[in-house]
Amino acid sequence: MRWKKLLFWGSALLSVGADQLTKFWVTQNFELRRPPAQPDTWPLIQNVFHFTYVTNDGAAFSLFKDSPLLPWLSFLVCLGLIGLGLFGPRFPQWEQAGYGFLLGGAAGNGIDRIFLGEVIDFLDFRLIQFPVFNIADISINVGLACLIFATWQSSRKGSRKTPTP
């Protein structure tokens, strides 16, 4: 296999690896406390940024909570992105990175959903009262940002080729 999609596979492996390693670290160093108990937390900057061990059995921001289809949806998204990586065309660099980060993020949270029944979250920005999240969530957002940038970049290139009246 030629490495014509190295950025795709590299960003996918980097993001799923970082996600699973950080979640392993959290499970080894924090105690999972179920509500109504307060979660185990470690303030890096008091009332600004904490590591807080919580779980989420829904998707982003607890959407689709308790849905039995969510693990299968994660699996199908990963399967589609793997298929794109194996059989799809060679995309420009920003698209490769974008799809790779999406795959890594979907796989990271999908692994949790399939094997644990819930996703481990631990990044807690208290200053802005943002929901607790994880590296996989960051990877998904980075992937979307890369794809938006790729679309913007290609539309700029396309508009340069169009003659003006």
Swiss-Prot record:
The keyword Transmembrane helix applies. One of its GO terms (biological process) is proteolysis. Keywords: Aspartyl protease, Cell inner membrane, Cell membrane, Hydrolase, Membrane, Protease, Transmembrane, Transmembrane helix. It is found in: Cell inner membrane. Pathway: Protein modification; lipoprotein biosynthesis (signal peptide cleavage). The chain crosses the membrane at residues 68-88, 100-120, 130-150. One of its GO terms (molecular function) is aspartic-type endopeptidase activity. It holds the Pfam family Peptidase_A8. This is Lipoprotein signal peptidase.
